[in-house]
Amino acid sequence: MVRVYAPASSANMSVGFDVLGAAVTPIDGSLLGDVVGVEAADSFSLQNLGRFASKLPSKPRENIVYQCWERFCQELGKQIPVAMTLEKNMPIGSGLGSSACSVVAALVAMNEYCGKPLNDTRLLAIMGELEGRISGSIHYDNVAPCFLGGMQLMIEENGIISQQVPGFDEWLWVLAYPGIKVSTAEARAILPAQYRRQDCIAHGRHLAGFIHACYSRQPLLAAKLMKDVIAEPYRERLLPGFSQARQAVAEIGAVASGISGSGPTLFALCDKPDTAQRVAEWLAKNYLQNQEGFVHICRLDTAGARVLE
């Protein structure tokens, strides 16, 4: 049996709408992501396990893991009889790349099981295609970091889908999922069709400055440039308590904060462990809305998707 783990990811990172994403892993060693298992069988089957399995579609053909298997078989031009298991540990509609976790884990597991017939670029292209079935448009800002690890910048030119941007070891990512669901499609529909020139200029300045600060090793400058004029001003209304939480974490000492993906998860960047702990405690007490909510203190996951022994 092949078992593959795919980590959670935080897309957009305020400054890079649809073009930046980071894979994350809890500092306590726990796994925040999905696991897909593949083993030989006489015919295809799919079993759903894990904390959030009950939230998955009841019809197997609507399950994205089934669609990954179907698409992988199509790519190879043959049916591959396997028994697949999805351990759904990620909440759906959380802003933590839940669908990307399932897509990446499923496709990497199938590729490993079949002896790696597809290279990383082809795999990533198929991942983006399948992610697009859920969110409504092909985009790679969750699947690329989830698959490849680290902080990824979407290029989509010259045969290159994404490339890694150097992160900062001292950054701690406090991720607070309040326990409610925000549909990616709904969060995209709320955005304007056109933007003011001054917002386009500000967005370009922030993103270019952020990438420059990452390469020139200026962590505080990079954090200060993590501002969003494209999505967050419009999406805040979908997230109860977000603006108050953002103000509170800044007062505690977070160097940046924003919406993870399309929400409702909030991310807060801290450069000191004690600050991260205080931010996590405040968010656990004030931002979570039900028993399904959680807070994790994370670092960048530089490994990406990996086979579990």
Swiss-Prot record:
Cellular localization per UniProt: Cytoplasm
EC number of this enzyme: 2.7.1.39
Membrane-crossing residue ranges in chain numbering: none
Main location per the UniProt record: cytoplasm
Record-linked InterPro entries: GHMP_kinase_C_dom (IPR013750), GHMP_kinase_C_sf (IPR036554), GHMP_kinase_N_dom (IPR006204), GHMP_knse_ATP-bd_CS (IPR006203), Homoserine_kinase (IPR000870), Ribosomal_Su5_D2-typ_SF (IPR020568), Ribsml_uS5_D2-typ_fold_subgr (IPR014721)
GO function term, MF aspect, one: ATP binding
Binding-site residues for ATP, renumbered to this chain: P91, I92, G93, S94, G95, L96, G97, S98, S99, A100, C101
Family: Belongs to the GHMP kinase family. Homoserine kinase subfamily.
Matching HAMAP family: Homoser_kinase (MF_00384)
Descriptive protein name: Homoserine kinase
Record gene name: thrB
